[in-house]
Regions:
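Short, solvent-exposed loop/turn segments enriched in Ser/Thr/Gly
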Residues: 413-421, 487
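Active-site-adjacent substrate/metal-binding segments within catalytic domains
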Residues: 1-117, 123, 127-128
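Substrate-binding clefts and catalytic carboxylate motifs of secreted carbohydrate-active enzymes
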Residues: 23, 91-93, 113-120, 127-144, ...
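Extended low-complexity, serine/threonine- and proline-enriched intrinsically disordered segments
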Residues: 334-342, 437-452
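Short glycine/proline/serine/threonine-rich loop/turn segments at secondary-structure transition edges
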Residues: 484-490
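Short, hydrophobic beta-strand segments
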Residues: 357-363, 464-484
């Protein structure tokens, strides 16, 4: 619902840009969590061909909406369904997320009430409810006195149901009311759920980006990418990663000012895990090399929502001789790996867990090249180079590794709009300098103004509404507002 330095005042072109990045990764569906989204956003989903799971609530009588639920639930459901039932993108209606008293009689009564209302307005689409992995036995807790309903729902208590079969018996009661069994973080029980409830499809309404739980422990660090699971089970129709983009709020504590366990940073920079998902989702040939680098700062991610600390560089000035762990994400038949022209033999992606090749390379400055092959022919490649000293700043929009410039000239739009530009520290050959962290200043000439800066670091305490910001992982971005006036707009980074 927000876009980094813009806050919640997000314009249509910024949503288009973000959806385009997700589409490039192979994403084809959006869960609009957990409220009704703007018409402009859904217009784009119609236009760009995204499936949308739309839901009207998070919690019901608990949480912030609780004071309005009894009075407003019916009008809010009507407003959502009547507004959007003729849209091409809407494929599923959601009526709640991780609510209180899940699977208990009081909850089931409200679930039926909501589901019946939606069906009376639109009988053409399935209805579902996103289940928390926690199920609890009945208690006499007064929910109106719970200050943090999400914490109450999430935390383990003495009423927690640990037995998987007893948990599935609660799920079966929910399944009698909804059309699709929607599970948050419950991939480890899909087989058991399907065995007990074979006539309903399963949807992963929230999944971790890298880890899975264990049958005997809800939260575990099992290395199994949840988004690959729908390709294994024909009764599982998909999964929604929490989340596609970092967002403000729901911080795990200072200095983080938001959620950082996403595929893409607030300034559109991809994390390496994004390429893992692209290798699963996309039919386009993918090969991408990253290193594991524990010298990088902790980004304050909530543990199970995190992924191993990979980074896109080949630069370890602190080492003379050491072995560097790496990861190669690819959907190709085979991958060839070279370090300074010397080949190292590695397994095929199909022979590796999650299709992700891992191993070690000896540190030496130079170039790492990975080449993906399909049907015996080169289909894609990725190179990372040890950079020299940073000598310039280069805008992504102007840098083709032949000419890198710290000024970019823009055309005039037909109407006022926002535009995000990213600049990188580069060496004399145009190679990105990942470890550079100096401060970059932005200036603009012409019919435009700077509305914010963003380096993608959710733990930075630098304000967004400035003209300068430190580089993070060698880059920083500036958000412009362009006016529909004659003339040239020039943007400078220095």
């Amino acid at each position: 619902q927000e876009a980094g330095c813009l806050g919640t005042a997000v314009t249509k072109e910024i949503w288009r840009e973000r959806l385009t990045h997700l589409k490039k990764l192979g994403c084809n569906a959006i869960r609009a969590a957990h409220h009704t989204y703007s018409e402009e956003f859904l217009d784009l989903c119609d236009e760009m061909g995204f499936y949308v799971y739309e839901e009207c609530f998070d919690k019901w009588k608990g949480g912030l909406y609780g004071r309005y639920f009894d009075k407003n639930w019916e009008s809010d459901v009507e407003a959502m369904v009547k507004r959007d039932r003729n849209r091409a993108c809407i494929v599923i209606w959601g009526v709640g997320n991780e609510v209180e008293n899940q699977g208990q009689d009081s909850m089931l009564a409200i679930l039926k009430q909501l589901s019946d209302k939606v069906r009376s307005l639109d009988s053409s689409r399935p209805i579902t409810y996103a289940m928390n992995p926690h199920f609890k036995r009945e208690s006499n807790v007064d929910l109106s006195k719970i200050k943090d309903i999400q914490q109450f729902v999430d935390e383990v208590s003495d009423t927690e149901i640990y037995d998987a079969k007893e948990r599935v018996s609660r799920i079966a009661k929910i399944a009698e009311i909804v059309d699709i069994i929607s599970c948050n973080y419950q991939e480890q029980w899909y087989e058991l759920i399907h065995e007990q409830i074979p006539n309903k499809l399963i949807l992963g309404t929230e999944v971790y980006e890298y880890f899975c739980g264990h049958y005997d422990q809800m939260q575990n660090f099992t290395e199994q990418i949840p988004s690959a699971i729908p390709f294994e089970y024909d009764y599982c129709i998909g999964s929604f990663i929490w989340t596609g983009y970092d967002y403000l709020g729901e911080s795990m504590g200072y200095p983080a000012k938001g959620w950082s366990g996403a595929l893409i940073r607030t300034n559109n920079e991809y994390r390496p895990v994004a390429y893992m998902l692209k290798s699963i989702w996309s039919e386009e040939p993918v090969v991408h090399f990253s290193v594991m680098d524990y010298s990088l700062d902790d980004e304050g991610v909530k543990e199970h929502w995190d992924s191993p600390i990979y980074a896109d560089h080949w630069h370890f000035p602190q080492f003379r001789k050491t072995l560097i762990p790496y990861m190669i994400a690819s959907n190709c038949d085979e991958v060839h790996l070279f370090l300074n022209g010397k080949q190292f033999f590695i397994p095929r992606p199909s022979e590796c867990k999650n299709g992700i090749i891992t191993g070690f390379l000896p540190w030496q400055p130079g170039t790492v090249t990975v080449v993906g092959y399909q049907n015996g022919k080169e289909a894609c490649r990725h190179e990372v180079v040890t950079p020299g000293m940073a000598v310039a700043l280069a805008f992504d929009q102007e840098c083709d590794h032949k000419e890198c410039v710290s000024t970019v000239n823009l055309g005039i739009p037909e109407k006022k709009q926002h535009l995000l530009l990213t600049v990188r520290a580069v060496d004399e050959n145009g190679n990105s300098c990942f470890r550079e962290s100096g401060k970059v200043h932005f200036a603009v000439e012409g019919a435009a103004k700077i509305v914010g800066v963003d380096n993608g670091d959710i733990c930075s305490n630098e304000p967004y509404q400035e003209n300068s910001v430190h580089l993070y992982h060698g880059c920083a971005s500036v958000m412009l507002e362009l006016y529909c006036k004659p003339g040239r707009v020039s943007v400078h980074a220095f």
